[in-house]
């Protein structure tokens, strides 16, 4: 087994960090926990030889850090957060491969939507057309872009300082490229817009999706507002294995507005007024979520 060394918890002007000294690169996995909010990292092949967990006051989001030897070769690191809401984290090794670094994003100082950096992903695009309308034959990629642009317009009109679009045109973008773009944009949150489809034309309704429990509340707030459009409820779906739900760096939510395969839903999707109202409800859901986290 590899013996762990000292831990160091500190912050800079943007992030907090938990650094774990190790003699070599070891595999790890992480998870978010809520009530209380924690990041938990399991390091495989590691046995504790740690005598120092130094915690500096420059760390503002990391409230406490400790470890537990789960098994002879599994070291679990607990990172307790200062706020209930997870704002994201990233795990990497330093260039020498001897220090596992957990970078923790702090809660923004203001919960005003105007001061947020919000990313919007219009699903599909270019060669990837997505689903098609059951009667009209419209393509998902075109209408996700229309709704995304309406959301961008609504947010900017409301004063949001920064809105990042993964695409503004009908262009082909694969998932790794989108993830790299989003990592560079470093948003406070991401909303991805899609239109659903089923082999049964009776299936209908709106839904939201998330992967990590720490990001669930954003999808809940958006779904609550979407249901005000008198759409059927298809539900809030967790543990969703979608590429853009995978990054842990920022809260994210996938919105499946309605079903293109259902004649009633399709008719509404075609309506420009409905597209505007969807954008408005998503923005209201974001505002509700920010208000809850003040």
Residue ranges, per PLM feature:
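Short linear recognition/processing motifs and adjacent strand/loop elements at protein termini
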Residues: 1-119, 126-128, 139, 143, ...
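Active-site-proximal helix/loop segments of hydrolytic enzymes
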Residues: 41, 110, 132-294
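Substrate-binding/active-site groove segments that recognize
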Residues: 121-124, 206-208
């Amino acid at each position: 087994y590899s013996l762990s060394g000292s831990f160091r918890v500190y912050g800079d002007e943007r992030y907090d960090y938990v650094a774990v000294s190790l003699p070599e690169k070891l595999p790890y996995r992480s998870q978010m926990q809520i009530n209380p909010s924690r990041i938990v990292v399991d390091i495989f092949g590691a046995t504790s030889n740690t005598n120092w967990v130094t915690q500096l006051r420059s760390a503002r989001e990391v409230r406490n850090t400790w470890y537990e030897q789960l098994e002879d070769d599994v070291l679990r690191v607990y990172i307790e957060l200062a706020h209930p809401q997870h704002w994201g984290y990233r795990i990497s090794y330093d260039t020498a491969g001897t220090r596992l670094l957990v970078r923790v994003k702090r809660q923004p100082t203001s919960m005003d939507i105007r001061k947020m950096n919000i990313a919007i992903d219009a699903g599909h695009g270019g060669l990837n057309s997505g689903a098609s309308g059951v009667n009209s034959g419209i393509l998902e990629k075109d209408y996700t872009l229309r709704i995304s642009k309406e959301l961008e317009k609504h947010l900017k009109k409301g004063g949001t300082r920064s809105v990042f679009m993964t695409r503004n045109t009908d262009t082909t973008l694969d998932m790794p490229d989108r993830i790299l773009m989003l990592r560079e944009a470093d948003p406070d949150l991401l909303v991805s817009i899609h239109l659903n489809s089923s082999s049964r034309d009776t299936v209908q309704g709106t839904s939201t999706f998330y992967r990590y429990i720490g990001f669930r509340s954003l999808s809940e707030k958006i779904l609550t507002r979407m249901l005000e459009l008198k759409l059927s409820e298809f539900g809030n779906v967790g543990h969703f294995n979608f590429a853009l739900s995978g990054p842990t760096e920022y809260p994210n939510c996938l919105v499946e507005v309605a079903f293109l395969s259902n004649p009633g839903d399709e008719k509404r999707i075609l309506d420009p007024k409905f597209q505007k109202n969807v954008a408005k409800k998503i923005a209201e859901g974001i505002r509700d979520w920010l208000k809850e986290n003040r």
